[in-house]
């Protein structure tokens, strides 16, 4: 066992501090005059503080001997010069060395107490107004509150960045709130894993059978399964999973579930032969979506008089002749209020949508086009010649901090002006977003939902597009014919082969489709890097920024985590003068391709033409345009939408040189390099391979194991998603409803 070393002294300087995890490198000046390098989780530390550090020596290859902290005692500075160093270090914005010196000269050892408790006394110093005094006091009070909260969390090995979210939600009382019920940390605000909060709560003395623990575990299981696509869970599965999580009896858990139902936190309803348990917001989304969709289906929308003559006019104007199913879809748009249009690549969905748009224009309707992601909306605009926007922006999605939930400007109280709405990439739309869209439609609005039912389902809960099709309650057109021009593309031919359960043709040069067999993961990684850095740019004249690497998984040699690190080194290496920020174990550098990984409704962005808006959404892709000299902020550019991000917001983004196939849904790239190696069984399925192939527009290069690819094509297993939408549509009007 290594000998524990103890050193006591004053923080001389902070060399490095990671805002996300609190990892810090500092210089400690001991009373003997020794300067010791200390490393460890020491959040919110500043020069002048007094530390007692217990740990072990380690030798860093570049920085030499350093003390790795295992235990830590810290106190605020108690000497005037230490107080000056602390105050002038930046702990209180707006107080630099000059102002700090004047404050310490006036108040001496009482300085920190006065700043926190009696900031109005700062007016005793010439040049500090009443307003300035209160501003300094408030900033210092916030700093001290955040410091105490970080110290509290660090005792339970919780990341310091969590303190920012807790303080935003609960203010000065955050510690009291967490002490009263630590299980709140596993809610939507903080998202801490239940096992972590459970360990914390039990160490604080909470009983194993306490109400807080039982209810938190049930909610955690429902939320966890929501994140895996389920709208509800069967009651027996929920109870079994929760009992296993808690190692307790079913009677206690069932009583807690009944209590949650009484408090309206969950809804229990029989769906077919299943007793379904919903989080209340998901139950409301599903039932509302069903009711509003049925109302649209019941409206009298028959404008058959337009159909035959108008479709013929459109064909003449556009210089085309529709295939029978395309004509059927365009005519249906005039006859019914809601239609579904589905088909794979090359089957003419875009041509059909253009025809429906032309039809609605001739009917004099106000038309709105939308898609789930910014890239899908941009592509929809390019293909139709009309403006399209994301569903989120169409509905005016914002974040209500007080209620801690998403809200929409467009609802039944303030509906959209549109008389016809066309939504593309419907397979990506989850039940909550679909419900919000329907709430914003006026009675009588025509609705056209377009997508590819064979692609992966939405990341969010539900299987909306598939449920709508399988209900057989809505007029649906299946485009199956691959047109001659599209048939010339090996990408499209192979995508349809995969969709039929056949392996793609992996032999030879097929023009826009190449396969490079690599059965060793490290060789596959090396090939992917070579393709992106030299072979494709040099031989195919495709710039690296137009190449997207896709992979089924995040983990492993061919996962996004490893590939992004290596691709960043290859395509955007560290160079003198290029700024970068270390965030956790990741480096973000000017020029990096990045992706928004969770919705942020408050981000303010601006375009070059002066257009201003708010909100960045999960899956938005951009690049780092600038990093401030001090590293306190970044400027990000998302396809022309430029937004400032604080360092704390780096938890919302990730590198995007490589993306998972799921994340790439709704996007299309000039060139796709697919790393296809054996992975988790749930990812080695046909839907993942099919979705990956259909992301490539001009060139697809598959690098990987041919046996794994054939296995994926043959495996049509789909993960079951618990959803009641299809059942509700089919049983509308039943007494059980």
Task: Annotate each PLM feature.
Residues 453-615, 625, 732:
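Conserved helicase motor core of P-loop NTPases
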Residues 1-306, 737:
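Accessory, non-ATPase domains that flank or precede helicase/AAA+ motor cores in DNA-metabolism machines
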Residues 48-50, 591, 619:
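Loop/turn positions that initiate beta-strands
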Residues 270-345, 351:
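Pre-Walker A segment
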Residues 355, 359-365, 371-383, 392-400, ...:
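Conserved helicase motor core of SF1/SF2 NTP-dependent helicases
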Residues 500, 618-737:
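C-terminal accessory regions
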């Amino acid at each position: 066992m290594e000998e524990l070393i103890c050193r006591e002294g004053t923080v001389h300087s902070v060399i490095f501090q990671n805002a996300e995890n609190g990892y810090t490198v500092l210089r400690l000046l001991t009373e003997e005059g020794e300067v010791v390098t200390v490393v460890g989780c020491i959040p919110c530390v500043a020069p002048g503080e007094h530390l007692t550090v217990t740990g072990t020596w380690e030798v860093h290859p570049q920085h030499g001997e350093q003390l790795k902290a295992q235990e830590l005692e810290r106190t605020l500075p108690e000497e005037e010069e230490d107080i000056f160093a602390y105050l002038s270090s930046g702990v209180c914005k707006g107080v630099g060395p000059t102002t700090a010196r004047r404050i310490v000269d006036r108040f001496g050892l009482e300085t920190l107490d006065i700043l926190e408790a009696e900031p109005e006394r700062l007016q005793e110093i010439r040049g500090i107004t009443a307003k300035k005094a209160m501003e300094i006091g408030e900033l210092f009070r916030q700093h001290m509150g955040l410091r105490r909260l970080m110290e509290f969390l660090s005792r339970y090995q919780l990341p310091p960045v969590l303190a920012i979210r807790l303080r935003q939600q609960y203010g000065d009382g955050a510690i009291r709130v967490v002490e009263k019920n630590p299980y709140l940390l596993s809610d939507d605000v903080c998202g801490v894993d239940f096992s972590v909060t459970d360990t914390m709560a039990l160490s604080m003395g909470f009983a194993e059978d306490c109400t807080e623990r039982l209810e938190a575990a049930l909610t955690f299981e429902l939320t966890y399964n929501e994140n895996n696509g389920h709208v509800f869970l069967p009651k027996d599965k929920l109870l079994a999973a929760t009992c296993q999580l808690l190692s307790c009896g079913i009677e206690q858990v069932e009583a807690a579930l009944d209590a949650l139902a009484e408090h309206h936190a969950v809804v229990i309803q029989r769906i077919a032969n299943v007793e379904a348990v919903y989080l209340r917001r998901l139950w409301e989304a599903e039932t509302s979506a069903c009711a509003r969709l049925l109302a649209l289906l019941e409206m009298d929308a028959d404008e058959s008089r337009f159909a035959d003559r108008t479709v013929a006019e459109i064909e003449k104007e556009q210089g085309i002749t529709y295939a029978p199913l395309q004509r059927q879809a365009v005519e249906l748009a005039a006859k019914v209020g809601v239609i579904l249009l589905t088909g794979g690549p090359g089957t003419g969905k875009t041509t059909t949508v253009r025809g429906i748009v032309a039809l609605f224009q001739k009917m004099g309707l106000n038309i709105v086009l939308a898609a789930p992601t910014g890239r899908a909306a941009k592509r929809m605009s390019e293909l139709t010649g009309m403006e399209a926007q994301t569903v989120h922006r169409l509905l005016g999605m914002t974040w209500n901090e007080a209620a801690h939930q998403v809200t929409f400007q467009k609802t039944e109280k303030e509906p959209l002006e549109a008389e016809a709405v066309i939504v593309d990439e419907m397979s990506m739309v989850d039940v909550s977003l679909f419900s919000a869209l329907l709430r914003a439609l006026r009675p009588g609005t025509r609705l056209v939902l377009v997508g590819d039912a064979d692609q992966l389902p939405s990341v969010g809960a539900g299987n909306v597009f598939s449920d709508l099709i399988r209900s057989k309650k809505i007029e649906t057109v299946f485009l199956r014919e691959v047109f001659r021009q599209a048939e010339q593309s090996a990408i499209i031919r192979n995508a349809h082969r995969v969709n039929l359960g056949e392996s793609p043709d992996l032999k030879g040069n097929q023009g826009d489709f190449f396969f490079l067999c690599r059965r060793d993961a490290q060789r596959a990684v090396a090939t992917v890097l070579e393709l992106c850095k030299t072979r494709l740019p040099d031989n195919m004249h495709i710039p690296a920024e137009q190449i997207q690497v896709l992979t089924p998984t995040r983990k492993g040699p061919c996962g996004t985590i490893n590939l992004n690190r290596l691709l960043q080194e290859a395509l955007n290496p560290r160079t003198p003068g290029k700024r970068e920020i270390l965030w956790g174990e990741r480096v973000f550098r000017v020029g990096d391709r990045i992706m928004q990984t969770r919705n942020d409704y408050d981000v303010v962005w601006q375009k070059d033409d002066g257009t201003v808006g708010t909100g960045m959404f999960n899956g938005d892709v951009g690049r780092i345009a600038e990093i401030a000299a001090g590293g306190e902020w970044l400027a990000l550019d998302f396809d022309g939408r430029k937004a400032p991000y604080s360092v704390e917001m780096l938890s919302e983004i990730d590198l995007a040189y490589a993306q998972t196939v799921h994340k790439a849904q709704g996007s299309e790239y000039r060139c796709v390099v697919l790393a296809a190696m054996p992975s988790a069984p749930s990812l080695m399925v046909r839907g993942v391979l099919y979705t990956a192939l259909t992301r490539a527009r001009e060139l697809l290069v598959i690098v990987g194991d041919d046996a794994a690819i054939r296995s994926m094509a043959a495996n049509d297993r789909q993960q079951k998603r618990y959803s009641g939408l299809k059942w509700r549509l089919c049983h509308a009007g039943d007494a059980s409803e």
